[in-house]
């Protein structure tokens, strides 16, 4: 698929043509998959049901002392992406019910709350390493993460399901391949929203080695967040496999310490 780099109407029409030719037609002609409007509407409903469950689970991270860790949520998100919806949905809804009664630790066990943004992270051990350094991942805005991607698909009145799906993914998509100014600003505002809603102390921007798109985005976005929004940022580059653990641990520990110092300074100023 050749995805467009803008989100306007021309790009949407091109995107729809690409998906029709290279996805729907292939699924129908070569694999016998039902791609009718009725089948797509049923798939959208399953998708929305899964999104509601995953989003509700993730919302627990907004609490001052969440009953779920960032590592646990990372595993849940990955499972929800690779397992058939009809098989995984009962377990997700069961997990949601369990979390509603699970008692958190008596005292918040982490020293800071952070948002992680950047290239794909499909290894939960990365999140575990970060949380072992004292920073709970309260929001995951990276490839394969929970933001964006868990919004429900809205099918408007009189709209074909296929058109709604294409419109949804093009307009909600915040991949850094989108280079127009509106999309860039949208990504910055999304980070600001996550920091506020999930009460994060800072943002960790990571880019996978040789991922040029996130390497550029990381530089610009970290500058905007720090200089214009006053949000502390830590930027790192990592391998696909979790290597250089010692270096990452040192960076994470130093960032957590800086967040603690800033928090203490803010509290001291508030008492004066």
Regions inferred by a protein language model and the residue ranges of each:
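A charged, amphipathic alpha-helical module
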Residues: 16, 23-152, 180
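Trp/Phe/Arg-rich N-terminal binding region typifying the photolyase-homology
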Residues: 1-37, 143-144, 149-268, 272
């Amino acid at each position: 698929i050749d995805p467009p780099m803008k989100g306007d109407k021309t790009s949407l029409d091109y995107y729809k043509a690409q998906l029709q030719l290279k996805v729907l037609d292939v699924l129908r002609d070569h694999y016998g998959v039902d791609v009718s409007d009725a089948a797509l509407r049923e798939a959208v409903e399953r998708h929305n049901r899964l999104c509601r469950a995953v989003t509700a689970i993730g919302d627990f991270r907004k609490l001052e002392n969440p009953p779920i860790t960032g590592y646990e949520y990372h595993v849940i998100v990955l499972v929800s992406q690779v397992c058939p919806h009809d098989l995984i949905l009962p377990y997700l809804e069961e997990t949601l019910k369990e979390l509603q009664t699970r008692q958190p630790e008596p005292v918040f066990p982490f020293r800071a709350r952070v948002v992680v943004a950047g290239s794909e992270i499909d290894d939960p051990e990365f999140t575990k390493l970060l949380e072992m350094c004292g920073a709970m991942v309260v929001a995951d805005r990276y490839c394969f993460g929970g933001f964006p991607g868990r919004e429900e698909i809205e099918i408007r009145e009189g709209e074909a399901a296929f058109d709604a799906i294409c419109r949804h993914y093009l307009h909600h998509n915040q991949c850094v391949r989108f280079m127009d100014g509106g999309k860039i600003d949208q990504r910055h505002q999304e980070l600001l929203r996550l920091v506020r809603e999930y009460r994060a102390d800072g943002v960790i921007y990571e880019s996978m080695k040789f991922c040029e798109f996130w390497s550029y985005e990381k530089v610009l976005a970290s500058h905007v967040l720090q200089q214009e929004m006053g949000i502390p940022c830590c930027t790192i580059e990592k391998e696909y496999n979790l290597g250089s653990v010692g270096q990452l641990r040192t960076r994470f520990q130093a960032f957590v310490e800086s967040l603690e110092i800033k928090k203490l300074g803010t509290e001291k100023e508030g008492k004066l």
